[in-house]
Amino acid sequence: MSYRMSRAAYANMFGPTVGDKVRLADTELFIEVEKDFTTHGEEVKFGGGKVIRDGMGQSQVTREGGAVDTVITNALILDHWGIVKADIGLKDGRIAAIGKAGNPDMQPGVTIIVGPGTEVIAGEGKIVTAGGMDSHIHFICPQQIEEALMSGLTCMLGGGTGPAHGTLATTCTPGPWHIARMIEAADAFPMNLAFAGKGNASLPGALVEMVLGGATSLKLHEDWGTTPAAIDCCLSVADEYDVQVMIHTDTLNESGFVEDTIAAIKGRTIHAYHTEGAGGGHAPDIIRICGQPNVIPSSTNPTRPYTVNTLAEHLDMLMVCHHLSPTIPEDIAFAESRIRKETIAAEDILHDIGAFSIISSDSQAMGRVGEVAIRTWQTADKMKRQRGRLKEETGDNDNFRVKRYIAKYTINPAIAHGLSHEIGSLEVGKRADLVLWNPAFFGVKPDMVLLGGTIAAAPMGDPNASIPTPQPVHYRPMFGAYGRSRTNSSVTFVSQASLDAGLAGRLGVAKELVAVQNTRGGIGKASMIHNSLTPHIEVDPETYEVRADGELLTCEPATVLPMAQRYFLF
């Protein structure tokens, strides 16, 4: 006779199952388990008196015979494709299977074989997500990378050379010499990294040189002159060599207006950074381009979400980041032209309806590298409180909204930049770059971060203690962050053209160099999962009011946010 457990007892032992709901941190977002791949009564769990023991849940199968390297048991997977309960098998640094783990000699329906060579990570009661991707990085200081890793990011894409003034303001690694030095430096970090070259040129020669030097993308920035000629030249090179282009348009409208930029793009795929405009772009109506089918629009996190403090902090932030002086009236006017409460409020709603596709940081250059996930979920929470349930929801939960928002910093930036064949989602065959979360700390403080199947970071107590938990507990690099494990657990992304030109042999770096692919005509706004809406956007040039398909987009600023001070008392 089978043993019956209450739902509460079952969830406490094995984690939630179908129909159970989980609150995300202290938000008003609730997810519900849609499917359970495990078998009730045949669950595997590690520990004294538990299932994963020799001859029970652990088989005699060798690694060569099919046993996985690592199993994450009874995890609640949260990804763009679903919210499901499953065991996760990892092998050779990749996701080998999502299903039912155990001993096929003793248990039915086993799709993930646990053997003597299998390590166990207890996923009971934990949420597992794909590692986050930040697609707007100013590489101003290397310490950003550890900050990002400890927040749950496993891939960073952008440009820079350190605290040079070009890098402080723009997301570019200019020239093949600097790109080579950054690719060499990447060996030192437990993080997947990708570098963008400078895209501002009216002739292609120097841009081709950077792509052949390893640039995965080219960045057009107004501080270098984002003219129609530069836009056209940059996109022409990108189309020839299959790299993405990111654009920060002309705030001052010196070389043209938003219509001129759209005309210069000529329908070609482009990633529009901080499309709302506070981070830079045609004032006051750059936000209009989010309705273009070839434009992939993104946000940087200081405007996420719109709060009572957003406007005030942006003015000071902008003066520092763009080398402006508070004693020069023209500089003050430039700064004030970029900060508009009406477009920032509209940005909240455009994210909620899926018209803005990506959220990134703009690290140390009007953005916070460790708050990509936090700001994303704060925006989702604010929108639920102000706008209620989304019409796409099918149950008494927030599953669709949560899938929409997690896609903004996982799969969508990966698709936009040609990395989705390797990273961006928790799917079989992709790199095992995973983040485990205690639901109470979801999006704020990870429980564990894996890179290429190895544990790279985790909160850890006193190393001299008799157990791992005594205070002080803080985030520390783990074994995956050291030695050759570090260089074998993460990769550096480059262009295919650079690999064909022998870049790996010339630089002799330890990390694998992996080519980006399908960044041009094969993708566009329609490729952005759960975030592909293309409304017709209008901006009143005098009041800055924003309308989408004729509807006024406005909301109140938040006065209180979740995932904030109560999580950072210490």
Swiss-Prot record:
A molecular function (GO) term: nickel cation binding
Entry's EC annotation: 3.5.1.5
Report any one BP term from Gene Ontology.
Answer: urea catabolic process
Query: For substrate, which residues are the binding ones?
Result: H221
Annotated positions binding Ni(2+) 1 = H136, H138, K219, D362
Could you list this entry's UniProt keywords, alphabetically sorted. Answer: Cytoplasm, Hydrolase, Metal-binding, Nickel
Q: Quaternary state and partners of this protein?
A: Heterotrimer of UreA (gamma), UreB (beta) and UreC (alpha) subunits. Three heterotrimers associate to form the active enzyme.
Similarity-based family: Belongs to the metallo-dependent hydrolases superfamily. Urease alpha subunit family.
UniProt protein name: Urease subunit alpha
